[in-house]
Amino acid sequence: MGGAGTDWLSVGVFAAFTAGVLVLSAMLGRRTSSAGGYFAAHGQVGWFVNGIAFAGDYLSAASFLGICGLIAFWGYDGFLYSIGYLAGWIVALLVVAEPVRRLGKYTFADALNARFRSRAVTVAAAVSTLVVSLFYLVPQMVGAGALIKPLLGLPHWAGVALVGVVVTAIVATAGMVSTTWVQFIKGALLVGLCTLLVGLILGRGFEVRDPGPPRDAPARDVGSVTALPAWAVPGGEPGPDGMVRTEGARTGPLGPVEFLRVFSASEVAAWRTSKVPAPDGTQRSVAAPERIQGNDLLLPGNSPTFRGLRSGSPLDRVDFVSLMVALFLGTASLPHILIRYYTVPDVRSARLSTVAGIGAIGTFYVLTLYLGLGAMTGGRLDTGDSNMAAPLLARGFGSVLFALISSVAFFTVLGTVSGLVLAGSGAVARDLAAAALGRLPEERMQVRVARIAALVLGAGAMALGLLCRDLNASFLVGWAFNVAASANLPALLMALFWRRATGAGVAAAIVAGLVSSLGWVLLSKDAFEKVYGLPAADALAPFSQPAIVTIPFGAAVGVAVSFLRPRSAQEHPGDGAGHPAGERAG
């Protein structure tokens, strides 16, 4: 930390945010004794509030911390995630928003099972909701742990535990009512503060700075220092160590387009990490600067994830396409996003709230490009933790902005985790409980079970956050989108738009997509290398992102089972346009 004053300021801002969230939840908790209040905020949330809450729910730790970090270290590759995340809202707007609001009530399974009244569909959808929510929870908890040390000086595990405790309090006390307002406030603050930070980046422009005293060696231990690791060079000659120094050269304020033009024409020193043998026989992580042309960093293919785009390997290219497919189709398959449609009063509000959400989310993702490049060329980077790029960039503009950005980043984690825990607890309290009992529990019992489930999910999220602390948040979310799109999208489209779909077919599509995508991810090269610590060559899956295979596989299984298994007596065909039989849009 920069000093005692900065420490206390950060602590004070953080404490104010956290206290405000807890007080809000306690006040709103009195209005959520019914299932309608707890799971859907009584269906009376305005479309604009819901739209900004969509942004607060969707713009997770991966969006803010992970993408900014990827851009800060690898350039345009990180922005590819932004493009994929935003494009997915087109599917949400054009395909699922209206029918999900029309058919569902409280959970993802409600909309999926409106036609079939099938226990198999209910159980499959509930299990899928829990698995996807847990997968998505991991990067949020990783982001929380990364933030807590520079913000409060506490260890990683303390950040994970703090998020778990606060989120459990939010969800257990007031459910969707408090979650909606936490997400609305978070979405507005995140977009507003990031806009301010980008304005400061553009106002500063580029400056060639002295990177510090000469180094005795070209590499330093990862994470041992938080240094000024990269700087743009509008001109100049290399010095003895190969670095260009024209100390004090400035561009002055730049517009958004001019900023990218100057960056493209400059040479940038970016840090790269690698592992080297240590004297004791272990592997030691070190970081060293590498000179790269700015225009090269504005092209894809620099990061390990997307390097295959330049390798010419067909499998590497398929891996990239598969990730983009998952990001594009995954948004409309995320249960914690879909249940937000139940909070608005009608179909028109569902559509308008999606448009408002797209506006806020699109604005934010454009800002991430400038945040990441600003961190690369003028901020502070922790070479051992890319997730800290945005908060450390803010520190360069003063302790107040650092405290605000870091607290909002932590608030970002709270908003997303609240939605995920609420989706999972609803699946347990309504769907699994109904399947076990053969009927829905009475409303007060549903709320009671949901609150207990929130406690269990919060504990599970904390455990997973500790196990996966060293992985990049956006990387982990890519896996979550693969699993969500594979398990949920084929089943959702079948249930909403295919007259011949049966309950058995929809349940089979969920199971096939879920099992195949999970199995593929766990057997992939990335899992072997980054999770298990094993050689990537030992992996059984040919590439890491499974959506391009597992989405069609789940759909094929669902279609085949629908043809092979006749419709049961309680099922009805629907009209193939997202309406139950006999119902039309008004």
Where does each model-flagged region fall?
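Membrane-embedded helix-loop-helix hairpins and adjacent transmembrane boundary segments
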Residues: 1-586
